[in-house]
Design a protein with these regions (language model features):
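Short polar/charged helix/loop
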Residues: 162
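Aromatic side chains
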Residues: 77, 110, 125, 152, ...
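Short beta-strand segments
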Residues: 77-79, 101, 147-148, 181-183
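Flexible, active-site-proximal loop/turn residues at the rims of small-molecule/cofactor binding pockets
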Residues: 80, 151, 210
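Surface-exposed, charge/polar-rich loops and edge strands
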Residues: 7, 11, 15, 21-33, ...
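A structured binding-face within diverse protein domains that lines the active/interaction site
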Residues: 128, 148-151
Length: 221
């Protein structure tokens, strides 16, 4: 059975568009094919989410941040269209140090930014990224990392965009900063296809709050 027909036989396009699809399994697909299907469907769905959801995400994180004085260096990301935008944290909590990723070949490094407008430039993948002249911050100095993704699960798995930048970056050390997946609630699934080497998030944050507050275990509680 062709890949597209297998999917359409199980879930209607209305279910996908409405955000009702929280956990689906398509038979006879490899993990790679299953991930590819999820990426496309999730991209379509997240484009419809209102900007107010990003504001709610920032609000929930600020509530947690005020309880965590040890989180001094925070890794953020510059969003693609349709992704949560958490960059307002720089103005909301200016006493912390914020770092952002810059792609270098097949890898990436994080740079300290103070002003996003003047200290970023157009980079690959349609993203803005820090200027190379901005100070580089080593992974060992990052206290907490907010990670983008196409989707996340309650089991804290992350479905990335497929390029593997975060996986390779985090594989540098076994001592990771606290990892928080950031997504919209309709892209938080019960389960996702995953592999043994996939790195788990410590928690997942949506406009409805931290997943750990809804019963999922987390080291951040």
């Amino acid at each position: 059975v062709p890949f597209a027909e297998s999917f359409l036989a199980i879930v209607s396009s209305q279910e996908v568009a409405s955000g009702e699809l929280k956990n689906f399994q398509v038979p006879n697909l490899s993990i790679r094919e299953h991930k590819a299907l999820l990426r496309q469907q999730c991209r379509d769905r997240r484009m419809a989410v209102a900007a107010t959801a990003s504001q709610a995400i920032v609000g929930h994180f600020l509530s947690r941040l005020h309880q965590q004085p040890a989180w001094q260096t925070i890794a953020l990301f510059l969003p693609l269209p349709g992704e949560p935008d958490v960059t307002s944290l720089l103005a909301a909590a200016p006493d912390r140090r914020y770092v952002f990723p810059r792609v270098i070949g097949k890898g990436m490094e994080f740079h300290h930014l103070i002003d996003i407008t003047s200290q970023t430039t157009a980079g690959p993948w349609g993203l803005r990224e820090p200027l190379a002249s901005c100070p580089v911050v080593a992974i060992e100095q990052i206290d907490i990392m907010l990670c983008p993704g196409v989707a996340f699960s309650h089991a804290r798995h992350r479905l990335g965009k497929g390029a593997g930048f975060y996986d390779r970056y985090l594989a540098q050390t076994s001592s990771h900063p606290e990892l928080i997946g950031v997504t919209f609630d309709h892209l938080l699934f019960e389960e996702l296809p995953h592999e043994e080497h996939d790195i788990l998030m410590h928690d997942v944050l949506t406009e409805k709050g931290f997943a750990s507050q809804k019963g999922a275990s987390s080291s951040l509680q």
